[in-house]
Amino acid sequence: MGRKGKVRAALAALLLLAGTAACGDESGPDARQPKKAGAAIRVDRPTALADQDVHVSVGGLRAHERVTVAAHAEDQRGHPWGASGSFTADAHGDLDLSRSAPRGGRPYTKPDSMGLFTAMLPRSGPGTKMIGSGDAFSYHPPSPAEQRTYDLRLTVSRKGKQLAARTLSREWLTGDVKHRKLTVARDRIEGELYTPAKGAHRKAPVLVFGGSEGGNSGEYAAALLAAHGHPTMSLCYFRCGKGSGRPDAIDMIDLRYFTRAAELLRRQPGADPRRLAVMGNSRGSEVAQLLGQRHPSVVRDVIAYAPSSKVNGPYLGGQVAWADGGRPVPTGPIPLNHVRGTVLAVAGGNDKMWGSAASARLIAARHNASGAPHRQVTYPRAGHHVNWFPYGQPGQEGGADGAVVSTSKADQAARQDGWARVLKLLD
């Protein structure tokens, strides 16, 4: 046998011994344990509406392994938001976020599969200066009119090394919902119209508008309601942008502008014209109640977030806030005895902007045209921003007691419970 032949024989012998040793290892007590392919993030709904929860778990970890789980997203300006927590896997190497709380109670204290979603804060950009200030701010992804979904990325890492990642799609609009931009020049109103597919079961149409922030802040809620089957419109009534034809102050804003929008909405496919509801937040709660009281033939139900029970003065100049057919609406308590349906007032007991909890109680003490009482729900530790939907609005605000973190967490809980009540009323 030549030199090359001897080398080949020696290598073959070594490989045979290695294979025998490996076979011997597999016959030991660990041979029956399946080999893990590595960490993996498991979710029950990779694509879900932005107001729907997702069950998140991680598998393929080592027994009792400590890892960091994080959520990441970008806002409409491309600035990153995120939240992360340290978690410990169980004896089987599994981690279920609905059963495990982050170590040290940060960024939230109790097991919650959606905890990282709602705990996100700005990671860079001007928003970081707002954290802990007590000033209100929240996450705004691209407008539903521009982008029907946004991405939320989950990652698992250990000591800075990424072990797993998964991107979830959070939907504002389902594929069968149609959108149309409304302008004062063409439609005599400024807003976004969302309609379900033709032939859909008729449901209550919903007209949504915000408060003193101006603009079209109700567009995310309107889009989600459309995804739930309701024809909706998010209406801008002031601060609608250059060239919009709308004023820049709450000054003689006429209820007929809102009823014009409501009449257009009532005619849409899938709309039950007898059941139209209006949804207003903060200063918008005033006009929502006025519409229910003064125009019951158009409006049935009213959802009033962080409400006032009275008409207040103008905002950013002027003489009176609201008008009806060109006539000023006087300041003072808003009667609700002509409302055809129900006023649902949703408030926070720690509201530093105004006494929305007291107003909610006053609203619930009043009765509609049939003699039935209106309703209210107050969340004692929540602040002014109890409005709209859960999960998709991380952010912060300070409460009347000065607390920021606890108020913001209470806001998130209020949105989850309050949104379910709103959907039930509308259905």
Q: Language model features by range: what are they?
A:
Residues 21-26:
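Bacterial signal peptide processing site
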Residues 45-49, 54, 60-65, 78-83, ...:
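N-terminal cap/lid segment of alpha/beta-hydrolase-fold proteins
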Residues 201-212:
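Short beta-strand element of the alpha/beta-hydrolase
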Residues 217-236:
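Short amphipathic alpha-helix adjacent to the substrate-entry channel of hydrolases
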Residues 248-269, 286, 290:
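Alpha/beta-hydrolase active-site loop
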Residues 294-295, 299-335, 397:
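Mobile cap/lid helix-loop segments that gate and shape the active-site cleft of serine hydrolases
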Residues 338-340, 345-351:
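Short beta-strand/loop motif that positions the catalytic acidic residue
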Residues 370-427:
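C-terminal catalytic histidine-bearing segment of alpha/beta-hydrolase fold enzymes
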